[in-house]
Amino acid sequence: MAEQYSHDKVVPDTASAESKKKQVAEMFDDIAPRYDFLNRFLSAGIDVSWRRKALAKLAPLNPKLMLDVATGTGDVAIMAAKQLRPEKIIGIDISEGMLQGGRIKVNAKGLETVIELKSGDSETINFPDNTFDAVTVAFGVRNFENLEKGIGEIYRVLKPGGRLVVLEFSKPKLPGVLQMYNLYMGLVAPQVAGAVSNNKKAYQYLNNSIQAFPEGNNFVAVLNKTGFTNTSCKPLTLGICSIYCGDK
């Protein structure tokens, strides 16, 4: 049985009796129209370079068939189509609102024959074993209802010799930077994002889930436990984001 982690129990609305999965899907449906704008604004655009660096970890594999888990509005899938030029990318997400926004972007860029965005759950990925050459997850593993189960499913659908690349928020280690980060993520970001999206709880949840997530070596240990090899963690931008890799 998959182990439970403290972050698995972090939810957008603690007063709700709904499951984390259902709450997260509803939350992203609600903020979907402003999601891309807030991503660029709150990160000052640096999230684009983070995605590019993460995808560079897949370049040596020259993947032909890719899966993007928690694809959201398709930012990683679209960038991967241009940067890695695979034959096909499947993006899955539990939020139909985010997928609708992603499909509009994919069609606008003429990538509809390369990228397919569809409803899908990380914990029950609807593909056979050993299907994909590479799997990506950007800012999504924190939202898994059961982290270990989701990572195990990714391992299952990845081909032998394939690679998982995860991009996820982490906490800086330098004391002065950590205090500034906590102030920004705990107070400033929820206030600003709440005013723009009319959903302050979504960005309070963002901070709470970052604080609870088993980052760094702890997440590498999860990858190792589920069978991945050659695992690694590379912090970016003073440690506020990290790239994790694991091979099957």
Residue ranges of each PLM-predicted region?
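A short glycine-rich, Lys/Arg-flanked "PGG" loop and its adjoining helix->strand segment in the class I
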Residues: E148-R163
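C-terminal alpha-helical "lid/dimerization" subdomain adjacent to the S-adenosyl-L-methionine
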Residues: L167-V222, T226, S232
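A short acidic, Gly/Pro-enriched loop at the edge of an enzyme's catalytic core
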Residues: E123-A134
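C-terminal lobe and adjacent flexible extensions of AdoMet/dcAdoMet transferase-like proteins
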Residues: V222-K248
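Class I SAM-dependent methyltransferase SAM/SAH-binding core
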Residues: L65-T124
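N-terminal auxiliary segments of SAM/dcSAM-dependent transferases
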Residues: M1-E26
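Conserved alpha-helix/loop element of class I SAM-dependent methyltransferases that forms part
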Residues: R34-F37, A44-L65, M79
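Hydrophobic beta-strand segment of the Class I
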Residues: Y35, V135-T136
